[in-house]
């Protein structure tokens, strides 16, 4: 249908370790994925752009940086840290094993990013947009914040384990969302801290 609109979920993993001189990644940053997932996302991204440009279809790419919520699985570091820290607080376990504590990510709340997706589809022109908070935190920052919220010293419980290191690690992801803010008026409502509070409180309710 000529009136149909489609949103394609692209990913910051498409950038790999390609970073602009100012430390950010944006719509014009070269794509250089370092994982099969990132490579597949680049393929989908380019396919959307090709069909939009060749056939005039309303197709949008949302280049989303890491977005979290209480629904996040514990196979991801935010979900894992939130759950295991709460378990430690409740006396259900006494150790948390993690990989690279120095990797940094631009973490935002899924609720904000879903709003961004919706805004893309309301606009009169299809385009590609980076969705991010513009603030990055290391895994160590994440651990320190979550444990401190639970009145715990993370150094008493967290150990690093090489089995959790990735073969080709993404060291730094931080997005520039100037374009979507200017054109669509999008602004994230959650901070890193309020996002993690949401996840901590959810696990406290589930595990108590």
Sequence positions of predicted segments:
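Conserved Rossmann-fold NAD(P)-dependent oxidoreductase catalytic core, especially the SDR/UDP-sugar
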Residues: 1-35
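Active-site loop of short-chain dehydrogenase/reductase
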Residues: 1-7, 56-58, 93-95, 126
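NAD(P)-dependent short-chain dehydrogenase/reductase
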Residues: 18-24, 42, 46-121, 134-150
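Amphipathic alpha-helical segment in the mid-to-C-terminal domain
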Residues: 36, 74, 78, 110, ...
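Active-site YXXXK catalytic motif of short-chain dehydrogenase/reductase
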Residues: 37, 41
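C-terminal "lid/loop" region of Rossmann-like NAD(P)-dependent oxidoreductases
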Residues: 96, 100, 127-129, 137-144, ...
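Non-catalytic, hydrophobic alpha-helical segments
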Residues: 113, 117, 131, 142, ...
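Amphipathic terminal alpha-helices
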Residues: 191-208
């Amino acid at each position: 249908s000529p009136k149909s609109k489609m949103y394609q979920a692209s990913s910051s993993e498409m950038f790999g370790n390609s970073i602009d001189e100012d430390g950010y990644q944006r719509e014009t940053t070269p794509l250089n994925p370092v994982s099969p997932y990132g490579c597949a996302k680049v393929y989908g991204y380019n396919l959307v752009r090709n069909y939009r440009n060749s056939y005039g279809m309303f197709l949008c790419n949302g280049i989303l940086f890491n977005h979290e919520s209480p629904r996040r699985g514990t196979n991801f570091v935010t979900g894992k840290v939130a759950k295991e820290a709460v378990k430690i607080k409740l006396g259900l376990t006494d150790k948390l094993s993690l990989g690279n504590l120095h990797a940094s990510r631009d973490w935002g709340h899924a609720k904000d990013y879903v709003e961004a997706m919706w805004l893309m589809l309301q606009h009169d022109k299809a385009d590609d947009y980076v969705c991010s908070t513009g603030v990055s935190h290391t895994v160590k920052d994440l651990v320190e914040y979550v444990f401190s919220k639970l009145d715990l010293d993370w150094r008493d419980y967290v150990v690093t384990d090489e089995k959790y290191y990735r073969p080709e690690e993404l060291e730094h992801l931080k997005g520039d969302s100037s374009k979507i803010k200017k054109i669509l008026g999008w602004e994230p409502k959650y901070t890193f801290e309020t996002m993690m509070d949401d996840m901590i409180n959810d696990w406290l309710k589930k595990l108590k």
